[in-house]
């Protein structure tokens, strides 16, 4: 009797487990099919010439939430089926739907970044960007997310710096500039651009990265580095070349170098804060190097000028 009871209990347990498994399978497959319908609704047609309409448009908040929830449900269903080694025809459907969804989110991410304006409803944009980034990263598409951010924001940063008058500085270019009568005008342009670049352009980019990738510190630092490092290093090329070329020139560039030194020195705390992470610390190191070189050059020029004035005074005496 005891044996019979044990056998019945075991069979009942097995039957219950099997029923539960079938129920879970069915639920996951339903989730995949429901997600597919919603995702296909927003599939990007590469051959279409119609105007792009964002899911995250102000009138589409319900659609955006529904889309992101569908992607999350799809990801959970895929994880369940793969972890339980389920050979389901819905796996291929899920994978295809996920690729379509990620392509859509890449486009949305790119478009919102292009339209991003720090002074106009930027908190809404940042919230949407963060939702997209977190969804893409959690679904295993971090590389694609980082790539879109880099391409879009680096272009925006470079354009902003160019608009301020920052050039791609070369030795030959600076040499001509120093010997030209309007050197002071070029320096004024750089000084103004430098202030805005540090206080506004790079500061706002740091703000954007910190909030969009708040849950992923490594990605946050990488994206800020990708978008700003090249432009920031080029920014400090100007004073660096001024010092190098001025070694052979007369000392009337003293006040130019003093202005450059004071400007960088004033922004030193902000520079140290913005470019503190190891991945972009080369910018901070270049700023320190510029200050050191400018300081040495100013002292040398001051001594030279003092000697010239003393010599001139002795001659007239």
Regions found by a protein language model. Give the residues of each.
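Long amphipathic alpha-helical scaffold regions
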Residues: 1-193, 197-200
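Extended alpha-helical solenoid scaffold regions that build the rod-like backbones
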Residues: 174-317
């Amino acid at each position: 009797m005891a044996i019979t009871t044990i056998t019945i209990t075991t069979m009942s347990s097995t039957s219950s487990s099997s029923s539960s498994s079938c129920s879970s399978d069915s639920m996951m497959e339903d989730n995949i099919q429901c997600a597919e319908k919603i995702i296909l609704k927003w599939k990007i047609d590469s051959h279409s010439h119609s105007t792009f309409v964002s899911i995250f448009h102000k009138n589409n908040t319900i659609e955006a939430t529904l889309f992101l929830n569908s992607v999350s449900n799809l990801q959970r269903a895929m994880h369940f089926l793969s972890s339980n080694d389920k050979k389901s025809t819905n796996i291929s459907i899920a994978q295809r739907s996920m690729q379509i969804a990620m392509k859509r989110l890449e486009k949305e991410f790119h478009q919102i970044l292009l339209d991003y304006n720090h002074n106009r409803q930027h908190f809404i944009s940042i919230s949407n960007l963060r939702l997209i980034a977190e969804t893409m990263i959690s679904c295993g598409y971090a590389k694609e997310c980082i790539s879109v951010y880099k391409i879009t924001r680096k272009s925006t940063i470079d354009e902003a710096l160019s608009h301020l008058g920052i050039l791609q500085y070369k030795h030959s270019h600076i040499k001509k500039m120093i010997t030209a009568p309007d050197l002071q005008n070029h320096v004024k342009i750089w000084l103004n651009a430098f202030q805005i670049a540090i206080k506004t352009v790079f500061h706002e980019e740091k703000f954007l990265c910190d909030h969009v990738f708040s849950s992923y510190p490594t990605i946050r630092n990488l994206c800020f580095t990708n978008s700003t490092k090249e432009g920031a290093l080029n920014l400090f090329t100007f004073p660096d070349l001024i010092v190098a070329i001025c070694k052979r020139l007369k000392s009337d560039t003293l006040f130019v170098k003093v202005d450059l030194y004071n400007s960088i020195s004033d922004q030193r705390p902000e520079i140290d804060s913005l470019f503190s992470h190891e991945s972009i610390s080369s910018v901070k190191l270049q700023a320190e190097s510029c200050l050191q070189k400018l300081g040495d050059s100013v002292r040398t020029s001051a001594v030279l000028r003092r000697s010239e004035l003393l010599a001139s005074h002795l001659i007239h005496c």
